[in-house]
């Protein structure tokens, strides 16, 4: 029986063989690597990945698709919402750093990216199909319209590169947006800032992105009795990632 894509799961199945081959080539999986695929769907990428790495862990929420996948001995199937999966624990169980791949559901792609942040130290790399607009925001530089909270939080932990553009017709059903594949390489020694603190800082800064930071972040810093130096005569989009990280470190107890 043909599986019908379910809108509530944000399902758009990759169906272009040439695109699949290009993505798998970019990933370059090898036997013995701890590969995890998020949202394998009908297996368009699963099949060529398994052919090259021999064993694969897949995370699939759709009950019917998970049942199909369980028929294959070379797959370890985790039937779960990806936002409930402990990737750090999965890495420990795999006795090696994870290589995470997937055609992510576009309706929850940003929450998935944030969910993966705490496990970055246990990850070798990540390759994801995403809405092209999201990839542009992830990789955006300061002083650009796409630069924002997502850019800062992800560029703290990863080197980010858009590696392949994918048109809507490569999917079934085709999404209404253009897509792109992003490569994310975790930095080996990122600044040791508190993730919650940095997240609050950046969210406050970008809460009114067109205003000078003295109207938003300035008040937030005053409430924390910050006595250091930080130029609030800038807009949030003008502040480099390194400056946000330095401020978060200065606000961390014991780092002042």
UniProtKB/Swiss-Prot annotation:
Binding positions for S-adenosyl-L-methionine per the UniProt entry: 12, 14, 39, 60, 81, 103
GO cellular component: cytosol
Main location: cytoplasm
Keyword field: Cytoplasm, Methyltransferase, RNA-binding, rRNA processing, S-adenosyl-L-methionine, Transferase
InterPro entries: KsgA/Erm, rRNA_Ade_diMease-like_C, rRNA_Ade_Mease_Trfase_CS, rRNA_Ade_methylase_Trfase_N, rRNA_adenine_dimethylase, SAM-dependent_MTases_sf
Subcellular location: Cytoplasm
Signal peptide residue numbers: none
Regions that span the bilayer: none
Domain of life: Bacteria
Enzyme Commission number(s): 2.1.1.182
Catalytic activity: adenosine(1518)/adenosine(1519) in 16S rRNA + 4 S-adenosyl-L-methionine = N(6)-dimethyladenosine(1518)/N(6)-dimethyladenosine(1519) in 16S rRNA + 4 S-adenosyl-L-homocysteine + 4 H(+)
Family (UniProt): Belongs to the class I-like SAM-binding methyltransferase superfamily. rRNA adenine N(6)-methyltransferase family. RsmA subfamily.
PANTHER family xref list: DIMETHYLADENOSINE TRANSFERASE (PTHR11727), DIMETHYLADENOSINE TRANSFERASE-RELATED (PTHR11727:SF7)
Task performed by this protein: Specifically dimethylates two adjacent adenosines (A1518 and A1519) in the loop of a conserved hairpin near the 3'-end of 16S rRNA in the 30S particle. May play a critical role in biogenesis of 30S subunits.
Protein name from the UniProt record: Ribosomal RNA small subunit methyltransferase A
Taxonomic classification: Bacteria, Pseudomonadati, Pseudomonadota, Betaproteobacteria, Burkholderiales
